[in-house]
Structure formats: structure tokens, C-alpha cells
């Protein structure tokens, strides 16, 4: 008896790639004007090269909320942060941009994929969980 596949059953890389293309095709996420010039954090020296980086980040954030829940802007700043290169001085950890995380979370809320959690952060909605599981099922069927 075959059961439905969830996000936990498929490769994270394959899922994020497939869900990002799903978000791009659906047209519900509107790209802000600044996506081609903004850096993703203080630690970065250049803006992302991939023109679809915004969709990939949104898909990754939706997956993380699906798996853990209760994540807010501060948590995503820490997750997507990294080591800032200081030239000849030692590197140090820096958080990523909070504006990008906030904007993506607001977009996911308008699409009713995530909602505010009473305990803080965001959690996945039932329609959002169904949407993510459908994409995971398509990935599992292809492989």
C-alpha cells in the first residue's frame, strides 16, 4: 500500500529546487524591485548571481517552517548568517539581512502558507502543508 510522501521523505535540495520553480510558476510571489541589487547580509561582498535567488530562499524558508515551526525573523537571520571575511583580521559570525527574511515571511503569509504562531514566530498552515506535500509527492513520483 503506497502512502503519500511528505517533505521529510525527499531530498532537501530537490525539494527546494522544485518548490522554488512552483512558486515562480504560480506567480503569487511578487519580486520586490530591489532583488537584483541587494546583498543577502552584511557578510556578503556581492549580490547573488542567480536571478531566482528570491524564490529559492522563500522555498527554503517554507521548508524550514514546515519541519520546525516557531521560526521568526531573528531565527532566519541566524540560520542564513555566516562568516564575515575581514581581510587580514580574523573572520567573525554575522547575521543575514532581516529585511529579506521579513519580506519573504510576509509574502508567504499573504499566500496563506504560513501564519503567525501564538507562541512566537510562524507556523505552517494546513493549506501550506498540503501544498508542500503535493510538491514532495511529485518529486517522489519522478524518482
Swiss-Prot record:
Pfam families, alphabetized: Ribosomal_S19e
Gene3D superfamilies with a match to the protein in the record: Winged helix-like DNA-binding domain superfamily/Winged helix DNA-binding domain
Keyword Ribosomal protein carried by entry: yes
Listed InterPro entries: Ribosomal_eS19 (IPR001266), Ribosomal_eS19_CS (IPR018277), WH-like_DNA-bd_sf (IPR036388), WH_DNA-bd_sf (IPR036390)
Cellular-component GO terms for this entry: cytosolic small ribosomal subunit; nucleolus; plasmodesma
Family matches, as PROSITE patterns: RIBOSOMAL_S19E (PS00628)
Keywords of this entry: Ribonucleoprotein, Ribosomal protein
Gene Ontology terms for molecular function: mRNA binding; structural constituent of ribosome
GO biological-process terms attached to the record: translation
Keyword Ribosomal protein: yes
Family indicated by similarity: Belongs to the eukaryotic ribosomal protein eS19 family.
PANTHER family tied to this protein: 40S RIBOSOMAL PROTEIN S19, SMALL RIBOSOMAL SUBUNIT PROTEIN ES19Y-RELATED
Identification of the protein by name: Small ribosomal subunit protein eS19y
Organism expressing this protein natively: Arabidopsis thaliana
Amino acid at each position: 500500500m503506497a502512502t503519500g510522501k511528505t517533505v521529510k521523505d525527499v531530498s532537501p535540495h530537490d525539494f527546494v529546487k522544485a518548490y522554488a520553480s512552483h512558486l515562480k510558476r504560480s506567480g503569487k510571489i511578487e519580486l520586490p524591485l530591489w532583488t537584483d541589487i541587494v546583498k543577502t547580509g552584511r557578510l556578503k561582498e556581492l549580490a547573488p548571481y542567480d536571478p531566482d535567488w528570491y524564490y529559492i530562499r522563500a522555498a527554503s524558508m517554507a521548508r524550514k517552517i514546515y519541519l520546525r515551526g516557531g521560526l521568526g525573523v531573528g531565527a532566519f537571520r541566524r540560520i542564513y548568517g555566516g562568516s564575515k571575511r575581514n581581510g587580514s583580521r580574523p573572520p567573525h559570525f554575522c547575521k543575514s539581512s532581516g529585511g529579506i527574511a521579513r519580506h519573504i515571511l510576509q509574502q508567504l503569509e499573504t499566500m496563506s502558507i504560513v501564519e503567525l504562531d501564538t507562541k512566537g514566530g510562524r507556523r505552517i498552515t494546513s493549506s501550506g502543508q498540503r501544498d508542500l506535500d503535493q510538491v514532495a509527492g511529485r518529486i517522489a513520483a519522478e524518482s
